[in-house]
Curated annotation (Swiss-Prot):
Belongs to the neurotoxin 19 (CSTX) family. 07 (U7-Lctx) subfamily. Pfam families: Toxin_35 (PF10530). It comes from the Eukaryota. One of its GO terms (cellular component) is extracellular region. Its main location: secreted. This is U7-lycotoxin-Ls1c. The lineage of its organism: Eukaryota, Metazoa, Ecdysozoa, Arthropoda, Chelicerata. The keyword Magnesium does not apply. One of its GO terms (molecular function) is toxin activity.
Length: 76
């Protein structure tokens, strides 16, 4: 009887861990999406990079989005 209960609890734990892992994978921010400056939430191999925006020489704030780690964009 104890073996049946132990086996049932072990299976429940394994199923719960698999479900939590699947939910965490779907919760990341995809490539090109807006992120926050805390650098958290982007999917693997992506980082949250922020750039200052200017209009007619006046700074208009900052925009952050998830891009590949190490990639830098520049205006030509």
């Amino acid at each position: 009887m104890k073996l049946i209960i132990f086996t049932g609890l072990a299976l429940l734990l394994i199923v719960s861990l698999i479900d939590v892992e699947a939910q965490n994978e779907g919760a990341c921010i995809p490539h090109g999406s807006v992120c926050t400056t805390n650098h958290a939430g982007c999917c693997s191999k992506l980082s949250c990079d922020c750039y200052r925006r200017f209009e007619k020489g006046v700074e208009k704030g900052q925009k952050c989005w998830c891009i590949e780690t190490g990639v830098t964009f520049s205006k030509e």
